Amino acid sequence: MDLFRLGRLSPDVLGALAAAGWTPERKIDIKGWVEPLEAEGYRLHPLAEEVLARVGGLTIDPIRECGPNFANDEPYSFDPLAAGVGQRALAAEIEDLLGGQYFPVGEWLSYSSVFVEAGGRVVAAGMGWIWELGATFEESLQLAIGADRPLVCLHADDGLEPWPPTNLKSC
């Protein structure tokens, strides 16, 4: 089942995926990740299952380090345990604020945890902020690897200003 289509990505982002070890046929066993995360209370959904089977374990370097309003100088690492172990309360907060069912898939800037929602939305969260990576998994790859649009802060905890500001110029 193809719940997303990586062929829709820009050639540069596809090249970064390939350089990280991805191939169109790639499907790996994800049981070793899913069992400990389910033990913490996460519920695997079909999109998260496909994301992890297709790109789990990969670390993808950015192709553009200067986003419109953020420095994109860290890789997108698909390690669901690093993103999710001990972070179930964070996922529950995201679910309460945004609705939906979120499953951890990896880490991005400043080790923020990346979660994919059953309906497709991808967010990153950490340090009191929640950011929109994309309405689809493909959009999240374009942003996190290609820095092709501004990073949008969806939520800031009390006492924090949204980051990055929409008028911030990076790099």
State where each predicted segment sits:
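Short acidic-glycine loop/turn motifs at beta-strand connectors
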Residues: V116-G120
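Short, solvent-exposed loop/turn segments at secondary-structure junctions
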Residues: L109-Y111, R121, W129-I130, G159
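Short active-site-adjacent structural elements
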Residues: S113-F115, L133
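Long, charged low-complexity regulatory segments
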Residues: D157-L168
